[in-house]
Amino acid sequence: MWKVIIRRILLMIPQLFILSILVFFFAKLMPGDPFSGLIGPHTDPHEVEALRRAAGLYDPWWEQYLRWLGNAIHGNLGMSYNLKEPVMTVIGHRAINTFWMSLLSVILTYLFAIPMSIVAARNEGKWQDQLWLTYNSITFGIPPYVFYLLIIFIFGYSLNWFPTGGTVSPDAMGIIPVFFSKIYHMILPAFSLAVFGTVGIFTYFRSGILDEQTQDYVRTARAKGVKEKVIFRRHILRNASLPIASNFGFVITGLLGGAIFAETIFGYPGLGQLFITSISGRDYSMITALILLNGFLGLLGALLSDIIMAMVDPRIRIQ
Amino acid sequence: MTEKKHKNSLSLVHSIKEELKKDKLAMISTIFLVAVFLIVYIYSMFLKQSNYVDVNIMDQYLAPLTTGHLLGTDNGGRDIIMMLMISARNSFNIAFAVTLITLVVGNILGVITGYFGGRFDLIFMRFTDFVMILPSMMIIIVFVTIIPRFNSWSLIGIISIFSWIGTTRLIRARTMTEVNRDYVQASKTSGTSDFKIMFREIWPNLSTLVIAEATLVFAGNIGLETGLSFLGFGLPAGTPSLGTMINEATNPETMTDKPWTWVPATVVILIVVLAIIFIGNALRRVADQRQATR
């Protein structure tokens, strides 16, 4: 077990290295540098020039790269040009918002997708199956932002059932009202994300159940006279969950990924919205940091997924 | 050889026709989609650029059913129906171009890596794994903002950087199952060249799958392009897209008080994409049947 994990972590090192080089050159392509964030109406351009020289922005690229990498590892990714704050501080604040909203949406997604796949797989070829297959092919194909817009138009602006922006209402005081106000602000984006996010789980879980139903061990269990309910719950469902587990690492790290469209449309101040406002404000140090963060989360997600798979599926450990 | 090929292509058309006859929804979708494409492309052929670029403030935000403007006008005083046509044409063009690049690159790379396998395939797969992990949406948006002299062709290029991977992996997986079949082994023993086996023997067997994949890729690209344009990082100004029309909805006041500026474009996207999905589902069933009966 530990051998698998250590080997997998070692495999991540070259990937991280490539990612850092990519993001570094990406940052170099963008105009501006960490000192652009310090320039205000009262700064002397010569002073900034001196700072740039002192920071080694005119050094050969590999020296700059190594220094940048060192800083990035220490969590120093420069100053935000627009917010005049360290990038990591801003990201930290926004990450909390994104985390809670994503958590709610992930929970809702599983609540929708799992019963859906079980119903579809148990009634293979019947109308229930057709219904959920069609539903998922539609949500997969329709651009989600169109749906988000209609949702906020109907439930946010026309019916006024839900707030159309922010994370908490200004007149909520005390822990419990603030908590409920936060949940209330999250419901619309999280629900929309969940309604449109079932297709991945549904496809894997449904075909997983269908595959497992025809396995020999299921036939053996039936022949032994095990009750159909028990076969389904104990044997089929457990094995069919493996493909879902294989994606779970990405789900965990995805909690901090930020949903660009949903957060922009629902006015939810998370990392996705931060990215769009940073792009519009040409806040390049922030953009670089967000891309680095998301790339890193992706690699970490792959790592976690592999470790989870090794934990739940003994066959992988043996290989 | 030629006779066999002819029969094969005939039965492909035949089985698609049969499936469409059974699936009324897909049949209606096909007719509808063809009609939409014809109307959009023929109508926009008769439009001059000044028609949809010039601004007429006097006619700004006219409500629907005003004289001469069945669906009203937008913030530049331009007729919504005309804007829908030209925007739909631009959005379809981008989606067509990206789909074409995706399919050509994806099919060639997929068949080659699936056929040869081995070390190159392994490295290539690691590479695609890595690219898939990258935050593609963010990188596309950054490219759009930092590329100098940005135009429609740059947008097509940028979107294509990430779009080919899914198709490549699908075609590779299917090619790998084909390689072990008897007809490929027989061709190899009789000394047919690798190139001929890959593209004259294996690839035609994947053609139904490719068509089904093409419809889904096309629908996805419409979503991606209009989404980018909606956020303001898609087609450049002067080239209206369905997304730029929907962008009117980002202003809460316009969204609630002047829904005619953005709702028609959303409806067009919804209906077109739905039609494509229904056709794609029917085609996928044909692909699965042909895979099973062979």
Swiss-Prot record, chain A:
GO terms for biological process: peptide transport; protein transport; transmembrane transport. Residues 95-305 form the ABC transmembrane type-1 domain. The keyword Cytoplasm does not apply. It comes from the Bacteria. It holds the Pfam family BPD_transp_1_N. It is a multi-pass membrane protein. Its main location: membrane. The chain crosses the membrane at residues 9-29, 99-119, 137-157, 183-203, 248-268, 289-309. It is found in: Cell membrane. PROSITE patterns: ABC_TM1 (PS50928). InterPro entries: BPD_transp_1_N, MetI-like, MetI-like_sf. Gene3D superfamilies: MetI-like. GO terms for cellular component: plasma membrane. Keywords: Cell membrane, Membrane, Peptide transport, Protein transport, Transmembrane, Transmembrane helix, Transport. Belongs to the binding-protein-dependent transport system permease family. OppBC subfamily. Part of the ABC transporter complex OppABCDF involved in the uptake of oligopeptides. Probably responsible for the translocation of the substrate across the membrane. Essential for uptake of peptides larger than three amino acids and for growth in milk. The complex is composed of two ATP-binding proteins (OppD and OppF), two transmembrane proteins (OppB and OppC) and a solute-binding protein (OppA). This is Oligopeptide transport system permease protein OppB. It comes from Lactococcus lactis subsp. lactis (strain IL1403) (Streptococcus lactis).
Swiss-Prot record, chain B:
The chain crosses the membrane at residues 27-47, 94-114, 127-147, 151-171, 202-224, 260-280. It is a multi-pass membrane protein. Residues 88-280 form the ABC transmembrane type-1 domain. Signal peptide: none annotated. It is found in: Cell membrane. Part of the ABC transporter complex OppABCDF involved in the uptake of oligopeptides. Probably responsible for the translocation of the substrate across the membrane. The complex is composed of two ATP-binding proteins (OppD and OppF), two transmembrane proteins (OppB and OppC) and a solute-binding protein (OppA). This is Oligopeptide transport system permease protein OppC.
